[in-house]
Amino acid sequence: MIFADIEAKINTKNGNEILLLKQEPKDRDYEKTVLIAGVIHGDEPDGEYLINHYLSNKTDTKNRLLFIPCLNPDGKAQNKRTNANNVDLNRNFPAKNWELTEKGDFFGGEKPASEVETQFLIYIIERYVPDLIITLHEPYSVVNYDGPAKSEAQKISDITGYKVEESIGYPTPGSFGTYCGIEKNIPTITLELPEKSPKDKLWETNKGIFDYLAKEY
């Protein structure tokens, strides 16, 4: 069972729900706000597993923790990278470097923020103004960051053993990291989980991140 409050929700094109879940301190004001989002790409499901595992076994927190376990349920249902409109959500943000590209796995949409999933995430950023954002991807086993997030990236690297990489190694026009980290100056981490890691090992490697976000950050 997942123990968290439903803060907001929307429906996708195919009628699936996207949930924003919240955990806050029980008896005092929160100190910082952290947003953690999984399954931006539908064929990268392990972020949802980690979030749900934490929320089923969570500890107390001094911070306000916001979770989107699965941003792209339509893509996940079809085990594909893109959403129901065949748009790569991580190329659909209204960053200055967004560009109209050929249709395919990396297609960023006909215009920036054309997708309901993207619009929901932008709303959350504007409504809750997080101090730190982490998105969970696969399969490179690295900690990539945008904006003023170097120290947080290094801490997560120390916890997981994944290397810190300031660049993912290829162009990402219209990416979430560029939009939030570089242009909005919000510390933004793209945590690349390993490919097809056994679930128990994946949790053991990454559970310290949630303790850090709840108690230390």
Task: Go through each PLM region and give its residues.
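Active-site-adjacent mobile loop/cap segments within catalytic or ligand-binding domains
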Residues: 171-217
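Active-site/substrate-binding loop(s) of hydrolase catalytic cores
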Residues: 30-35, 44-55, 59-170, 186
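Glycine-/small-residue-rich active-site loops that bind phosphorylated ligands and cofactors
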Residues: 42-43, 198
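Short, surface-exposed beta-strand/loop micro-motifs that present aromatic residues
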Residues: 17-26, 176-182
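Short glycine- and acidic-rich boundary segments immediately preceding or forming the N-terminal edge
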Residues: 1-22
